[in-house]
Amino acid sequence: MINISFPDGSIKQFAKNITAYEVANAISMSLAKAAMVAEINGELQDLSIVIDNDCKFRILTAKDPECLEIIRHDAAHLTAEAVKELFPETQVTIGPAIENGYYYDFARDKPFTNDDLAVIEAKMQELSQKNEQVTRELWDRDKAVEFFKSIGEHYKAEIIASIPAGEPITLYRQGNFIDLCRGPHSPSTGVVKHFKLMKVAGAYWRGDSRNEMLQRIYGTAWATKEQLDSYLLMLEEAEKRDHRKLGRELDLFHFQEEAQGMVFWHDKGWSIYNTIEQYIRKKIRKNGYTEVKTPVLVDKSLWEASGHWEKFRDDMFALETDDKTLALKPMNCPCHVQIFKQGIKSYRDLPLRMSEFGLCHRNEASGALHGLMRVRSLVQDDAHIFCAAEQITDETVSFCKLLTEVYKDFGFTDIKVKFSDRPEIRAGSNEVWDKAENALKEAVEQAGFTYTLNPGEGAFYGPKLEFVLTDAIGRQWQCGTLQMDFVLPERLDASYVAASGEKKRPVMLHRAILGSLERFIGILIEEYAGRFPLWLAPVQVAIATITSDLNDYALEVQKALIDNGVRTDFNISPDKINYKIREFSNQKIPMIAVIGKQEQENKQVAIRRLGTTDQEVLSVEQLIAVVKEENEKYL
């Protein structure tokens, strides 16, 4: 007999070699019917798994969040099965679950069309309704390679041949379809009911541009129809808010082939950029940071010493000149250490908070570039805090408070924290890691946050905090980070003189709030749907005259606004006033100052705020005061 422990603390005895499904059925027939997978000693397993030892046991159903990834993996197999039935000449490759869905890559001469997707989706519904049994099979490696070659699935044969010897080869069969997979999977295809195929894109085999191009079908799958409908509605809203679309419509920026991944900022977009930089600069000065500027192009010897050359060489832009190899910096930290090392530092100088709007370059694959969200040239709101070990908690608390203030000012109040602790391969002793992790945990709790743990996901040189924002339509964006570093000060020989007179290494805290300004602006465009708050809007007040004889007064108003730092635009053309208002509203300008004869006579303007038809009559001085008051809250 074996002892099986359940989540409620109870322990029951069962005969050896019982399956997970049989255990579920012994608990409740309804539970067995709803069961998708079992968690055995913390690992998800198929219901068909045989249990022959004592274990901790839990049954998972579609209601459990862990099962969403299972459903999506099931849906990927269902997609492949449907494609093979409809287009038997197509070869299947890989199909993992990803955030919000899954994809499956296919090798096929003829590209899939949108009409094909509709047919494939209908076939998937048919296969789901058949409720085909899904079974796990353990195969001999050579037999599996020969089998897939014999049915023309050469990509699968290649994958199996690359699996290290001794690892089990598991295949999953459903109906006439069989696929290589580690699993686990649901017991039948009927579990996958709520799905939709989204699009087709190109993808290189094994992600290598030297390999053949495959066709990637993206899909989404959910546990309930309500979840699917909600997600599709969110996507519809996200499409309206797409920063690339709004960037064109609002004349903020553009990209072009001659400079892939590099932003061409137009005057309005650059205004937003500079306003954010001005805002952050004010915040960090108030919080005791110095601001520096370091070179963009640095000899590779520094990157070799820091370890970046070995780790990130393929992602760096390098050039040869005067028998030297120079690289555009992908990050700022080694350069900040060079500033720290200028002159002797004492414990009295710590903590030293060094910030930079650092221009960095990363050689992202062209296929990974995505508007402002993924670029090759980026500016980080980067800072490094050089401190003693006993200052880590206080510095982290201060950073968390600063970060919270910044996010709140931009309208983000739902902030989640992820804590990544020690990986298996790491620098430093367990004692050092214990102190570091405890310092971060204590700081997060003092700052009023709760956190979720990412076990083993810290960098080899220290634990990490990630700060995740939730936007207006429920999407999550990881922006802020605080990364502890024991290694770089050692590698680059940074030190300070302790109170005892001995030389010590500072701890280095890498931290950012926005991440990159480019990406954060992309997030803001989508968060606000282009309707920037008054203090951040590239044009704060637009002036529109009702008749042309009011133009001289309109120009007087514009000059007064500009002289007082108000960003303005105007339209004194002969066009009708309703047309002018509509055009300025389409540009999402927060305030429109309408000027008629009465406004001219009284030295006033009629203010219409974006999204309303109400008008408020103000003197020019009052209008200036309203805008200045808003600006001064942030700038």
From Swiss-Prot:
Keyword Lyase annotated: no
Domain TGS: 1-61
Co-factor: note: Binds 1 zinc ion per subunit.
Stretches the record annotates as Catalytic: 242-533
A Gene Ontology term for the protein's cellular component: cytoplasm
GO biological process, one term: threonyl-tRNA aminoacylation
Cross-referenced InterPro entries: aa-tRNA-synt_IIb, aa-tRNA-synth_II, aa-tRNA-synth_II/BPL/LPL, Anticodon-bd, Anticodon-bd_dom_sf, Beta-grasp_dom_sf, TGS, TGS-like
Group of enzyme by EC: ligase
Keywords: Aminoacyl-tRNA synthetase, ATP-binding, Cytoplasm, Ligase, Metal-binding, Nucleotide-binding, Protein biosynthesis, RNA-binding, tRNA-binding, Zinc
Location(s) in or outside the cell: Cytoplasm
Co-factor(s): Zn(2+)
Family: Belongs to the class-II aminoacyl-tRNA synthetase family.
HAMAP family assigned: Thr_tRNA_synth (MF_00184)
PANTHER family reported for this sequence: THREONINE--TRNA LIGASE, CHLOROPLASTIC_MITOCHONDRIAL 2 (PTHR11451:SF44), THREONINE-TRNA LIGASE (PTHR11451)
Subunit structure: Homodimer.
Protein name listed in UniProt: Threonine--tRNA ligase
Protein's gene: thrS
